[in-house]
């Protein structure tokens, strides 16, 4: 929920997320398909609230959550619904981009959402106002959570990402997962963190969208397990 990258080459897309949480929080379940309303959604479920930070819908829509909007905020602990459940409401809707515009987010904690389905959108909710930023899906992007990283650290992580892309001739899911699974010699602010405060990178989750199909990979770093789950739907529309 704290680092997300979006990489595209032609009609191939790789979306990858690192989930950083306090060690008191339970690990997520492995990715499974669930029917939400009329659609199938594939996601790793957070057992605490039942939501998720990363979801893929049967038509190929992907939504990924980061905690916080533009700056670190003080949580008041009195919110109407978890952000992970909000994500599921959005991705399971018939038109996620439209639903997001109309959705009432009153008493929802600030968050950033990366939403992709043919179009790419960066959405931020700061607790008071919605911010929509359309992005070019033919370009590469990276996000870091404002709740965990200062601006200078976010800029440095972006530089690491840009260097990785410049040095990588042939992009593959393995190379991207390896990049996201590297602390880059920094346990405080690398892509894999292990802070004295108890904050730790729990997992790395990735969706690959290409002409050969759609696969979600989930690396459970806490329990040293990995899962590869192909989506069974034949309705994918890239």
Task: Spell out what each predicted region is.
Residues 1-238:
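N-terminal nucleophile
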């Amino acid at each position: 929920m704290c680092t997300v990258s979006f990489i595209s080459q032609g009609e191939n897309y790789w979306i990858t997320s690192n989930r950083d949480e306090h060690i008191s929080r339970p690990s997520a379940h492995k990715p499974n398909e669930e029917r939400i309303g009329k659609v199938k959604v594939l996601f790793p479920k957070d057992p605490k609230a039942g939501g998720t930070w990363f979801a893929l819908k049967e038509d190929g829509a992907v939504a990924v959550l980061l905690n916080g909007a533009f700056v670190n905020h003080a949580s008041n602990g009195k919110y109407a619904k978890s952000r992970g459940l909000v994500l599921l409401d959005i991705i399971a809707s018939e038109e996620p981009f439209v639903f997001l515009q109309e959705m009432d987010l009153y008493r929802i904690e600030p968050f950033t959402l990366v939403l992709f389905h043919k179009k790419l959108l960066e959405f931020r909710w700061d607790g008071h106002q919605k911010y929509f930023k359309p992005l070019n899906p033919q370009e590469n992007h990276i996000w870091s959570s404002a709740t965990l990283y200062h601006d200078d650290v976010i800029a440095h992580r972006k530089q690491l990402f840009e260097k990785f892309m410049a040095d990588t001739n042939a992009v593959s899911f393995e190379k991207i997962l390896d990049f996201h699974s590297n602390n880059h010699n920094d346990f405080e602010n690398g892509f894999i963190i292990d802070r004295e405060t108890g904050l730790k990178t729990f997992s790395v989750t990735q969706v690959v969208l290409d002409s050969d199909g759609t696969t979600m990979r989930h690396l459970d770093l806490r329990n040293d397990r990995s899962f590869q789950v192909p989506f069974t739907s034949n309705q994918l529309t890239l």
